[in-house]
């Protein structure tokens, strides 16, 4: 059957369908006309060309325009492979270029075809970590516009996919992809850079339902082939494929949720009604949603991220299902990517903040518009705490806590991944909003920016040029910004002025507990002073801030206070607030409760945290969870990791190994 399928799909090597090509829309970056140069600190660092070259790809992508792409693949759960062909319609930019250099990583390449030339010569160079193995295609001739087709198969070393057996799911095998940042090259041969965007068609054969980063156009029950289209040009890292025992339900007029059947009712309840509200609010802030549908795939427990912004089909962690809608702001984040990241994209991972900083900023604008400005500021407070924790835990903060990164030496972008581009980036935009005159002044720039760079990839200097160009009448204000600190200096950024209405009661309660821990010696004293009523009206996010503030020693932070000196007080805290904290089903609360207990050296919590780490795959919890265990019981941390390592995504597994030094 697989051989017959290959015969069927290899027809894509002959030519791409005329119908598909009629939908092709290619947008090339337009040069920006600058009336005046930027301040010297920015001009001195300006790259020779914009968008800046992407050093995280081995391809010669600057020589070509990819106008359309097509995937024709088969999912084989027994062999744990995805195989088939990828076809490109390409236009030469450099007329004298006669070889095509592509990205691969742990792929088998069986055949290459250019137009009517079968069995084109190709050479797969030796793999060099982390960028993979360069594929050099050498056709006898290369016309100005040509079709390239490559037949391939993934291997057991593939870093783009996680295969789950029946015992890791509700009973049937499952596979999902995670391609950001440079793992698309491990799924299919490509120009694996966010600088290259194209439209896509996909035909995917699988014995189980399939979802893809596009709109489904058909399903052939006789061949088990699912067909999709993506008419908005996207880079390879945004491709998303998943297949498994999936059911779906409506959660809005243009949205569905896909999930394993046993979770369908809970997932539908969690998201129903809120997604459309997010979409319409985002449309008011930016402009009309361009992708048609917005669906959500809730993956099994091992999914490593909170979400991945695959167009039309957000991939999400099951930790969002908190049974109280308290974590659905993650969906506001992934939805915001429909504009920042997916429509307007960083040209390389050095400028990742253009994706994530804008997205966090827009996410909080969306939730602030729905729930009030105080909610927006409160989310920023929690984000600030996350940023402090992320930077303090970094092994190389001097390098990786700068907003604009430097990965030109071939460093793995995954190693640079942190909350810095998210929180430092969003804080910069929030700072600019207030500096320039507030939302009323800044909002027209939002629409201008996303209109100007729609369907393009850009670098930080293009953002800055657009900013200075738009606010030409406020140049003196923009020149007063400490750009060196914001963009190029490691460490925390300047702290924003935030509305603390929702935080003040939290800070007061945290400080009261810390004072009492140092004063009280008997449980009865605590029980007289505190009760569950203290937090009965707190939202989950307020409880998160309470636990964060307790761990950091109060507000303002007291470095001299250590919970390890007051373990009894910590245990009493957990007992008094059991119904809202210990019994919570919100992973954000669960993790922070374990962190408080571990920091308090409550040894009974160590094996409990270890067991919990076997039930989640989200790196936001897994990585700091293992670091916590490693601080207090290295043997247990390593033993736990070896016990659960096969349940983690390859990216997660690799990074935890680094964290533990094994």
From Swiss-Prot:
Binds 1 zinc ion per subunit. GO terms for molecular function: aminopeptidase activity; epoxide hydrolase activity; metallopeptidase activity; zinc ion binding. It comes from Kluyveromyces lactis (strain ATCC 8585 / CBS 2359 / DSM 70799 / NBRC 1267 / NRRL Y-1140 / WM37). It is an enzyme of class 3 (hydrolase). Its EC number is 3.4.11.-, 3.3.2.10. A peptide binds at residues 178-180, 304-309. It is found in: Cytoplasm; Nucleus. Its main location: cytoplasm. The keyword Transmembrane helix does not apply. Its cofactor is Zn(2+). This is Leucine aminopeptidase 2. The active site is at residues 334, 422. Aminopeptidase that preferentially cleaves di- and tripeptides. Also has low epoxide hydrolase activity (in vitro). Can hydrolyze the epoxide leukotriene LTA(4) but it forms preferentially 5,6-dihydroxy-7,9,11,14-eicosatetraenoic acid rather than the cytokine leukotriene B(4) as the product compared to the homologous mammalian enzyme (in vitro).
């Amino acid at each position: 059957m697989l051989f017959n399928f290959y015969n069927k799909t290899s027809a894509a090597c002959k030519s791409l369908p005329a119908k598909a090509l009629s939908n092709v829309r290619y947008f090339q970056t337009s040069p920006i006309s600058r009336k005046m140069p930027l301040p010297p600190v920015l001009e001195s660092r300006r790259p020779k060309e914009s968008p800046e070259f992407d050093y995280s790809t081995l391809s010669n992508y600057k020589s070509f325009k990819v106008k359309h792409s097509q995937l024709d693949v088969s999912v084989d759960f027994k062999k744990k492979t995805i195989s088939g062909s990828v076809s490109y319609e390409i236009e030469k930019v450099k007329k004298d270029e006669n070889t095509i250099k592509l990205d691969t990583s742990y792929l088998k390449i069986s055949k290459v075809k250019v137009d009517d030339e079968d069995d084109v010569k190709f050479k797969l160079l030796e793999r060099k970590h982390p960028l993979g193995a360069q594929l050099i295609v050498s056709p006898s001739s290369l016309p100005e516009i040509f079709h390239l087709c490559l037949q391939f198969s993934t291997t057991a070393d593939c870093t783009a996919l996680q295969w789950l057996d029946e015992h890791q799911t509700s009973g049937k095998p499952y596979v999902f992809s995670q391609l950001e940042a440079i793992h698309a090259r491990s799924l299919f041969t490509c120009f694996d850079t966010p600088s290259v965007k194209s439209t896509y068609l996909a035909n995917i054969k699988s014995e189980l339902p399939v979802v893809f980063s596009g709109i489904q156009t058909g399903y052939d029950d006789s061949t088990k082939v699912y067909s999709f289209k993506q008419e908005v040009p996207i880079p390879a890292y945004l491709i998303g494929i998943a297949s498994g025992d999936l059911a779906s339900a409506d959660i809005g007029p243009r949205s569905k949720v896909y999930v394993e059947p046993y979770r369908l009712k809970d997932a539908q309840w969690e998201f129903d009604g809120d997604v459309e509200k997010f979409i319409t609010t985002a449309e008011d802030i930016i402009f009309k949603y361009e992708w048609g549908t917005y669906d959500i795939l809730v993956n099994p427990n091992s999914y490593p991220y909170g979400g991945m912004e695959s167009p039309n089909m957000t991939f999400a962690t099951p930790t969002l299902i908190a049974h109280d809608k308290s974590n659905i702001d993650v969906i506001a984040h992934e939805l915001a990517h429909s504009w920042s990241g997916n429509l307007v994209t960083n040209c390389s991972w050095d400028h990742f903040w253009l994706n994530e900083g804008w997205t966090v900023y827009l996410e909080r604008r969306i939730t602030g518009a729905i729930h009030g400005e105080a909610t927006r500021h409160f989310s920023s407070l929690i984000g600030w705490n996350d940023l402090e924790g992320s930077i303090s835990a970094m092994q190389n903060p001097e390098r990786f806590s700068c907003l604009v990164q430097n990965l030109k030496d071939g460093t793995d972008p995954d190693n640079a991944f942190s909350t810095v581009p998210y929180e430092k980036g969003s804080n910069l935009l929030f700072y600019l909003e207030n500096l320039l005159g507030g939302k009323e002044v800044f909002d027209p720039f939002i629409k201008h920016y996303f209109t100007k760079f729609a369907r393009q990839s850009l670098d930080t200097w293009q953002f800055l040029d657009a900013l200075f160009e738009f606010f030409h009448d406020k140049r003196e204000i923009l020149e007063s910004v400490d750009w060196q600190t914001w963009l190029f200096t490691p460490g925390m950024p300047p702290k924003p002025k935030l509305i603390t209405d929702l935080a003040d009661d939290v800070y007061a309660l945290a400080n009261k507990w810390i004072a009492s821990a140092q004063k009280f010696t008997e449980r009865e004293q605590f029980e007289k002073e505190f009760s569950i009523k203290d937090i009965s009206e707190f939202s989950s996010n307020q409880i998160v801030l309470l636990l964060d503030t307790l761990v950091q020693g109060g507000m303002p932070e007291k470095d001299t206070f250590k919970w390890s000196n007051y373990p009894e007080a910590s245990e009493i805290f957990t007992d008094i607030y059991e119904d809202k904290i210990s019994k919570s089903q919100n992973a954000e609360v669960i993790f922070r409760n374990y962190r408080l207990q571990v920091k308090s050296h409550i040894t009974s919590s160590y094996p409990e945290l270890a067991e919990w780490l076997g039930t989640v795959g989200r790196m936001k919890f897994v990585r700091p969870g293992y670091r916590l265990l490693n601080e207090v019981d290295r043997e247990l941390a390593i033993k736990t990791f070896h016990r659960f390592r096969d349940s983690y995504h390859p990216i997660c597994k690799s990074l935890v190994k680094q964290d533990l030094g094994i």
